[in-house]
Structure formats: C-alpha cells, structure tokens
C-alpha cells in the first residue's frame, strides 16, 4: 500500500525569524511538499522560506482564510491529505504524525490538534483564547452534538473531504467554518493533543494587541452566526 501524498500549508506574515525553523521541523518522511503562503509580508519571510526548501505562494490581500485558500489552489494534484499550521513557531510540526496517522490508517477524515489538551508553554495562549476554545466547543456540542476543545490552526484533513465542505471564509473565522461545516456534514472528526509554544519572534496578529483580539473575536462570532443559520 503506497503512502498518501501529504501537502503542508503554512500561513505566514512577517515571520522571517521563525519560518525556517518551522519548515525544518516538518517531518520530511511524511510531507510530500511544503507550501508557505506569504500573506503580504514586508520582511524577508518569502526569501527565508524559499531558502529553507518550501515553495512560496504570494497572497497580497490580507486574510487568514484567504492565505490558506491560496495555498490550497497551489498544492500538487497528487495531494490526498492537507496539513495546516502557522508560520510563527508556536505550532509543533514535529508532532505532525499525530494528525496524519489516524487519517492514513482510515480511522478518521479530519484531525484537529488541540492546544488545550496538550502541553502549553507559559504565555503561549492568553486566557481569553483558551476560554474561546471551550466556549465555541460548548456551542458546537449544542448545535451538532460534537466534542471540541479548541480551534487551533494545526490540523489535517483529507483533501476530498475538505473540497466537499466548500469553505468561503477569508478571515480568522476560517478554522471555525471548517469545524462547523465538517460537523454539519457528519465528517469523521477527532482531536489529538498537541503542544504549543510562544511564538518565535515577531508579533502576534491576534493576541498581540487588544485591537487584534477584538477583531478576531468579532470575525469568529460573525462566522459562527453565519454558518449556524445557513442551510448549505
């Protein structure tokens, strides 16, 4: 039985200090390709990522979901499993096997890395981020009867499953849209604990400022309401 082709998509915005280490930590025995989406960086993120062996895709219009969608448009036709993570060094790519193996073994189609269930470095997540994960999980349980403890960016999903979800969100609500549409479609989903670190340099686009936190929270709430009332 041949090993499925895995595409790793990394979203990055001004992450020149961290991106090389993130790329180097991706298990090369699992990843068929590594795509870094440069979402409008003004530093050397693209050059550093390319030098580290990743294929760089430019998406100049800001948007977390938009960046990942740009990455999806550029992945290999061979891709069967897609892994998503951030380029700031907070996720642990070396734990990718925890996400990919259950899919390869046919036990599930969608795996979410739960930061709240893993080991979190002090200061890596603010209280409101942890609370938001559990609150959204509570709402998802009420709406769809699914168990969820986090909306973490580090996740893996079968490509054909992802394409059927028809994601549209272009902002920080993108991970939540994926989870909500997967729940509504009764996609086989599981969580696995993953470790989480403080970012390696740069500044957080969400937790780094009050404005960023408020904007992200607002976008997530809008996404929650929009998907909850949609029929398709």
Which residues are covered by each model-predicted region?
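Cell-envelope/extracellular polymer assembly enzymes that use nucleotide-activated donors
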Residues: 5-7, 177
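Conserved donor nucleotide-binding strand/loop of the catalytic core
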Residues: 32-35, 46-74
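Short, well-formed alpha-helical segments that are part of the catalytic scaffolds
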Residues: 14-28
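Short beta-strand-to-loop acidic/aromatic patch adjacent to the donor-nucleotide binding site
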Residues: 79-90
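A conserved acidic beta->alpha catalytic loop
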Residues: 38-46, 89
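Short beta-strand/loop segment that forms part of the nucleotide-sugar
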Residues: 10, 22-23, 31-40
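Acceptor/aglycone-binding surface of glycosyltransferases and processive sugar-polymer synthases
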Residues: 60-74, 93-172, 199-215, 221
């Amino acid at each position: 039985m041949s090993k499925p082709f895995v595409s790793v998509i990394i979203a990055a915005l001004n992450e020149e200090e961290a991106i090389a280490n993130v790329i180097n930590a991706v298990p090369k025995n699992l990843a068929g390709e590594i795509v870094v989406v440069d979402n409008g960086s003004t530093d050397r993120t693209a050059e550093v990522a390319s030098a580290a062996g990743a294929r760089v895709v430019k998406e100049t219009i800001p948007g977390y979901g938009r960046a990942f969608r740009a990455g999806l448009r550029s992945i290999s036709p061979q891709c069967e499993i897609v892994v998503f993570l951030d380029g700031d060094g907070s996720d642990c790519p070396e734990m990718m096997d925890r996400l990919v193996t259950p899919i390869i073994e046919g036990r599930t189609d969608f795996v979410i890395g739960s930061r709240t269930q893993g080991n979190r470095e002090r200061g890596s997540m603010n209280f409101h981020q942890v609370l938001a994960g559990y609150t959204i999980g509570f709402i998802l349980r009420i709406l769809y009867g699914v168990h969820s403890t986090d909306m973490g960016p580090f996740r893996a999903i079968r490509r054909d499953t992802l394409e059927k979800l028809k994601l549209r969100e272009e902002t920080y609500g993108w991970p939540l849209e994926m989870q909500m549409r997967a729940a509504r479609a009764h996609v086989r989903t599981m969580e696995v604990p993953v470790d989480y670190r403080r970012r390696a340099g740069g500044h957080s686009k969400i937790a780094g400022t009050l404005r960023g936190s408020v904007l992200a929270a607002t976008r997530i709430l809008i996404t929650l309401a929009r998907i909850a009332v949609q029929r398709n």
